Amino acid sequence: MNKLPILIFMLLVCSMFISSDCQKHTDIKCSSSSSCYEPCRGVTGRAHGKCMNGRCTCYY
């Protein structure tokens, strides 16, 4: 039996869990993604973030 489809499925599921843990939703209001850089540096230690629906989402 070919185990390649099972391996690909498991890799996909694991990568989905890892990517969902890499973002932090905040209550910091924003108008553009550039206004999230400094607040995200305080939350995650990195200046990676974007403005989504008027709130900053920070990434690790």
Curated annotation (Swiss-Prot):
Highest taxon in the source lineage: Eukaryota
Annotated signal sequence range: 1-22
Keywords: Disulfide bond, Ion channel impairing toxin, Neurotoxin, Potassium channel impairing toxin, Secreted, Signal, Toxin, Voltage-gated potassium channel impairing toxin
Sites annotated Aromatic residue of the functional dyad: Y59
GO molecular function: ion channel inhibitor activity; potassium channel regulator activity; toxin activity
Cysteine pairings via disulfide bonds: C30-C51, C36-C56, C40-C58
Domain remarks in the Swiss-Prot or TrEMBL record: Has the structural arrangement of an alpha-helix connected to antiparallel beta-sheets by disulfide bonds (CS-alpha/beta).
Family statement drawn from the similarity comment of this UniProt entry: Belongs to the short scorpion toxin superfamily. Potassium channel inhibitor family. Alpha-KTx 12 subfamily.
Name of the protein this chain belongs to: Potassium channel toxin alpha-KTx 12.5
The organism of origin for this protein: Lychas mucronatus
